[in-house]
Amino acid sequence: MANTEFYFNVDSGYLEGLVRGFKGGILRSTDYLNLAQCETLEDLKLHLQSTDYGSFLANETRQLTVSIIDQRLKDKLMAEFHYFRNHAFEPLATFLDFITYSYMIDNIILLITGTLHQRPISELVPKCHPLGSFEQMEAVNIAQTPAELFNAIIVDTPLADFFQDCLSENDMDEMNIEIMRNKLYKSYLEAFYKFCKKLGGTTEEIMCPILEFEADRRAFVITINSFGTELNKEEREKLYPTCGRLFPEGLRMLGNADDQDQVKTTAEYYAEYKALFEGVGIGTGEKTLEDKFFEHEVKMNVLAFNNQFHFGVFYAYVKLKEQECRNIVWIAECISQRHRTKINNYIPIL
């Protein structure tokens, strides 16, 4: 056994074994078929009891709702993640911290947007993802500009380093909030990519392609979402993460795109992305581009488990569980609203 593998096992072998065991409990296609047959949320709860979720809803005395199921799913994932984080040595500890930063960004944006729409902070905080919670979160509503937000709250969080490009005295309207979200994600992805490169070895081999895809997905989505808005091409191009396969030529083409067809033309230069855009339809039951991106992400994360002695399995597990949560919540929503025609529109994992 090589020295690096030996040292990996000394510090992180136990946790890697544990995360692989947890991965074995991810729902399979037969589980989803059973869940989709359920008539009520109570039926859904019973079916989930026969899986690795076990009695995760057993202590719930309130009438079961989709939001309660969603919250309990997130709580279960958070408990598992915190166990990994509490037992991790460096550099795994920092790697796990990086995973939480994307949820912190989402939480901040959710709180700012909610405050903009006059929603009370007490109503917004429970909607935040527990993996991205931090102490100063509830004070977000006092900030009127990105600079105030940074000085009052962000400066003492790990996101401070990603915030340098976001500092402005602009008011926080919906457009500026969306620009802030994309600038934060750009800085975050580029920093995470650099960290994985520095780690080297199998972690770099597994994680860098995953983060490259995430960067490119964001570039495609930013471009498509910008059509019909006030965001000009120059501003749009500044939001693209530069650690993906599209950099530099693909990003230049996206920066000049005027419509969805030109975005698709850019994708055609990259075999992997060409296939994703080709399978997209707009009819009922046809897959959206978002679905295709999720499917590709799932595929990459499942493949991460084919190699040993790397940190990528922790990232992959969290992302697979996140997709699993989305799937269960989707099925629960369809049952709750008696809208069964779309109940099978989830993203299978295994």
Swiss-Prot record:
GO terms for molecular function: proton-transporting ATPase activity, rotational mechanism. GO terms for cellular component: proton-transporting V-type ATPase, V0 domain. Keywords: Hydrogen ion transport, Ion transport, Transport. It comes from the Eukaryota. InterPro entries: ATPase_csu/dsu_sf, ATPase_V0-cplx_csu/dsu, ATPase_V0-cplx_dsu, V-type_ATPase_csu/dsu, V-type_ATPase_csu/dsu_dom_3. It holds the Pfam family vATP-synt_AC39. The keyword Protein transport does not apply. V-ATPase is a heteromultimeric enzyme made up of two complexes: the ATP-hydrolytic V1 complex and the proton translocation V0 complex. The V1 complex consists of three catalytic AB heterodimers that form a heterohexamer, three peripheral stalks each consisting of EG heterodimers, one central rotor including subunits D and F, and the regulatory subunits C and H. The proton translocation complex V0 consists of the proton transport subunit a, a ring of proteolipid subunits c9c'', rotary subunit d, subunits e and f, and two accessory subunits. Subunit of the V0 complex of vacuolar(H+)-ATPase (V-ATPase), a multisubunit enzyme composed of a peripheral complex (V1) that hydrolyzes ATP and a membrane integral complex (V0) that translocates protons. V-ATPase is responsible for acidifying and maintaining the pH of intracellular compartments and in some cell types, is targeted to the plasma membrane, where it is responsible for acidifying the extracellular environment. May play a role in coupling of proton transport and ATP hydrolysis. Regulator of osteoclast fusion and bone formation. Belongs to the V-ATPase V0D/AC39 subunit family. This is V-type proton ATPase subunit d 2.
